[in-house]
Amino acid sequence: YKGIYKFSDGDIVMDEERRKFIAAVDAHAYAQYVKCPILFLTSTNSTEYDFDRSLDTLSRISPSVPYVFNFSPAFNVYLDEYCRKDVELFLASQFGKKNITFPICPELSIEQDGNFLALTLDYSDTLKIESAKVYINEGVINPAIRNWNTCDFVGDDESGKMKYEYVANGSTRNVYAFAIVRYKNGLTLS
C-alpha cells in the first residue's frame, strides 16, 4: 500500500506482486493468527506506514485476543514517551509480577451540524484519568503530512462521557480524528 492512501479516490490496481505481498507479508495476512495479547503502537505521521490502515490490521485480530493501542500524534518514524511507558507497563503486566489493568480503548464518535462538529469520547472508568485530548485534521488524504489540531473540551455529559467541539472550515470532504486518554497509573491509550 506504500504511496496508496486508504482514503484516496483512486482504486488500487491489484497486480500479482501486490496480491502476493498482501497475502504473505503484510500485517493483514497474519493478524488473524495472533493468539497473544497485543500492544499496538504507531505514529500518526509516518512516511513509512499508513496510519489510517492501523485499525484495518487490528480489525483482523480475533475478538477473543485482548489488544490495546496508542498513537503518537504528529510523530513520523518515532514514538513518544507515552508509548515507551505503555511498553514498560505492558511487559510488566504480561511477564512481570505486577497486576496492571489495561482498560478497553476509548471510542470517539462525531456528529455534524453544518460546519460544527460535536465529538463524544467514551472511555473506561476502571482507572482514574489524568487527561484526555481529541485530535482532528480536515481533508488531508496523506496521513504523513496531516497537521493535527486539538478539539475544544466543553464538559462531561450526563452519562460521564467527555464532550468536545470543533468548527470545520467548510470546504472539507473528509475529517480524521482520534482521542488519547492518559491514566494516572501512567498508561496511555488511543
Predicted regions span which residues?
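Hydrolase active-site cap/lid region
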Residues: 1-14, 69-71, 78-81
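Active-site nucleophile elbow and catalytic-triad environment of alpha/beta-hydrolase enzymes
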Residues: 14-30
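Short beta-strand/loop motif that positions the catalytic acidic residue
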Residues: 34, 40-42
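Acidic beta-to-alpha connecting loop that harbors the catalytic carboxylate
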Residues: 44-46, 72-73, 139
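Conserved alpha/beta-hydrolase "acid-adjacent" motif
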Residues: 46-53, 79
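Catalytic histidine neighborhood in serine/cysteine hydrolases
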Residues: 58-78
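Surface beta-strand/loop "capping" patches
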Residues: 81-82, 90-136, 149-170
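Short, aromatic- and glycine-rich surface loops/edge beta-strands on solvent-exposed regions
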Residues: 172-186
